[in-house]
Amino acid sequence: MNKKSIRDVDLKGKRVFCRVDFNVPMKEGKITDETRIRAALPTIQYLVEQGAKVILASHLGRPKGQVVEEMRLTPVAARLGELLGKDVKKADEAFGPVAQEMVAAMNEGDVLVLENVRFYAGEEKNDAELAKEFAALADIFVNDAFGAAHRAHASTAGIADYLPAVSGLLMEKELDVLGKALSNPERPFTAIIGGAKVKDKIGVIRHLLDKVDNLIIGGGLAYTFVKALGHEIGLSLCEDDKIELAKEFMQLAKEKGVNFYMPVDVVITEEFSETATTKIVGIDSIPSNWEGVDIGPKTREIYADVIKNSKLVVWNGPMGVFEMTPFAEGTKAVGQALADAEDTYSVIGGGDSAAAVEKFGMADKMSHISTGGGASLEFMEGKELPGVVCLNDK
């Protein structure tokens, strides 16, 4: 990575404004999944060990520029203190006199959590005045929030206009892993693209067709490709306005020598429920009032075989409606194939794919699980991320 990280700067005694991603799911004031807090620990611990005064900023939920009591970061600060094994202070503001006073009272190695930055309307507008207020608290800006790196907000990008700006360890790792996958991949390189909609994945499919040896398609978006081949798809998801594009992608794959894999059989149903009756049919045999909801067993075998023979696999998007047991087998099979493939480096592109490997207890078998759904998708589309562009070059 050609951006400076916290390893490249002197931190002792410095006030560090560190943007983290503590946007964790909450239920009745309790954190239900603390993965994102744990992901930030190495950076926070490094800053503490280096004798920095660690000022943490994050958003939580979508308060839309207003104070929403349930979205305060107080429970997060409390849990962070437990995980760090030290006293973590919490400010009820994200800038201004109260925050400044608390920062002024900090000693080297102290940790302070600021209030939810999205309580202020200027955050999502990347307001320069708000960015200046944040910058006034600190000597150095550290961005460790890869999950928000695709957003040009005051605390992720704007603040870098007023302070030296470097990446944290999590951000550095994300950029290294994803950057290497796209610029210098080990081969065979396979991308697995799933999820519901073609329109969400157009950019990533187009960009990856220039990079990969194999492209595997699954999930709801597969049926647009199936229809593009002239097959009936019953009530399956389809974007009729993307059929021509699907044809174009298949033609492009052929021209570029990319092996393009699509389902050969699918799981179909007449209803969405945990007790739904399902059938397995060939891809050209979906009845008119049934809907495709997962890849079938033959497809799972083919996909697993491609995975096993790949050196690098990037996975973005599930193979079916994995949240429901009858439609989860395809996604589970892809996860299992990745877990079993010992010579394969697996990169899970955040969002639903990350949720799936967590759900099936396979997370520890994956080489890298990205902490950013939207950010990793935009990175894989070849877009520049505002939260990265703003960092100082080495």
From Swiss-Prot:
**Binding annotation for substrate:** 21-23, 36, 59-62, 118, 151
One of its GO biological process terms is: glycolytic process
Tell me which GO cellular component terms the UniProt record holds: cytosol
What highest taxon heads this organism's lineage?
A: Bacteria
Q: Where does ATP bind?
A: 201, 292, 323, 350-353
Q: Name one Pfam family in it.
A: PGK
Query: Per its UniProt entry, what is the enzyme's top EC class, as one word?
Result: transferase
Name the InterPro entries for this protein: Phosphoglycerate_kinase, Phosphoglycerate_kinase_CS, Phosphoglycerate_kinase_N, Phosphoglycerate_kinase_sf
UniProt entry tagged with the keyword Flavoprotein: no
Q: What is its EC number?
A: 2.7.2.3
Instruction: Name its pathway.
Output: Carbohydrate degradation; glycolysis; pyruvate from D-glyceraldehyde 3-phosphate: step 2/5
Molecular function GO labels: ADP binding; ATP binding; phosphoglycerate kinase activity
Q: Which residues carry this modification: Phosphoserine?
A: 183
Instruction: Give the keywords, sorted.
Output: ATP-binding, Cytoplasm, Glycolysis, Kinase, Nucleotide-binding, Phosphoprotein, Transferase
Q: Does the keyword Transcription regulation apply?
A: no
- Reaction(s) catalysed by this chain's protein: (2R)-3-phosphoglycerate + ATP = (2R)-3-phospho-glyceroyl phosphate + ADP
Q: Where in the cell is it found?
A: Cytoplasm
**PTM sites of type Phosphothreonine:** 299
Q: Which SUPFAM superfamilies match?
A: Phosphoglycerate kinase (SSF53748)
Self-association state and partner proteins as the record states: Monomer.
Q: Which family does it belong to?
A: Belongs to the phosphoglycerate kinase family.
The entry's protein name is Phosphoglycerate kinase
State the organism's lineage: Bacteria, Bacillati, Bacillota, Bacilli, Bacillales
Question: Source gene?
Answer: pgk
